[in-house]
Amino acid sequence: MLVKVSIENFKSFDCATELTMISSNKIRTNANHRLKIKSTQLLKYGVVYGANAAGKTNLVEFFRFFKECIRKGIPMEAAGMFCKNREENKERESGFEVQITVGDKFYAYGFSAILSKRKITSEWLYELYQNGSARCLFEREGNKRPILDSAITLPNTEKNKFEIYADDFEGNESSLFLTEMNRGKKYTVRSKLLFFKEVYDWIVTHIAVITPNTPLIDLEYYYDTDSLKLINKLIETFDTGISKVKIEEISLDELSNAMPKPVFDKVMRHVKSRIEEQENPSFRMTMRSNESFFNIEVQGHEEPKVTTIRLDHVKSFYDFGFEEESDGTRRLFDLMDML
């Protein structure tokens, strides 16, 4: 889970800015919105409010940028991503750090860079403990050789491999060592270097940036009778004019006609893949594009059941399709799982 992020000299973030998911002791209701890992209470969800140009989009952009750096290196466009509020920021270090949990372990991984030069100046990974202490697993400064925690004792074979990786990486100012340690490297479950894989895998698989233009997402929405009652209760609290949300079954042909062929083919490959993974397949998935909303339910090896939503309005004799609603109303359905 995400614990905390820290951003400095990036887009609209000039000074170091933090977002924390650690729950306040003052929160005593909605216990199901929290998760306890060891002695730390973490929030499952977070909502960011702010006026226009307050930096909300740039927070999302940070997650996209951070993941991209880990996967492929600092992108070309990063040269202009430093905070432009002050002239000196062009040559000033930018800092990025995420604190996460993997299993019951807490990690802090980050790096600093001069974005205008796409030059990495430092990188670090710490394991954090409940008593407030931390252990540096590895760090690097500038183009120097990465240094492993001296307390980590490796078998000779693994030690020799790491020494080669670290020696070869010396002088590298354009790549992250975390990335290098996951480039075709294999780790056993007992390897004392497994933290390289754990942190890398978490970042590339658990950071998912979904924007209004994201064409397809896969969510666990269950629009059966019980969930429809809850959704209708929630929708009443918003001034949308919607009086009722209901589902309507459609055929696979209708689904095919409602979306571009490449998208439909991708969806069906995904459904087929999930069916093949299970001996007795049973799952539901929701697809949400900018103007479409479909649910696919699979029970056994029968043809998938496809439904879409229709909406009744207070002052209309006819129902409306999801694509006929305003963008703001459509975005409400993206938040239903959190609400």
Residue ranges and their predicted role:
Residues 108-267:
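Electropositive, glycine-dotted interaction segments
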Residues 96-101, 125, 311-313:
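Short beta-strand segments that buttress and anchor functional surface loops
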Residues 34, 41-47, 51, 60-118:
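Conserved P-loop NTP-binding catalytic core
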Residues 1-65:
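Pre-Walker A-like glycine/lysine-rich segment at the N-terminus of P-loop NTPase domains
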Residues 8-11, 101-105, 314-316:
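Short strand-coil-strand connectors
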Residues 45-50, 268-339:
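Conserved ABC ATPase signature
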Residues 20-25, 112-117, 141-145, 323-328:
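A short, sequence-level motif marking secondary-structure junctions
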Residues 14-16, 106-108, 133-135, 317-320:
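Short, mixed charged/polar active-site loops
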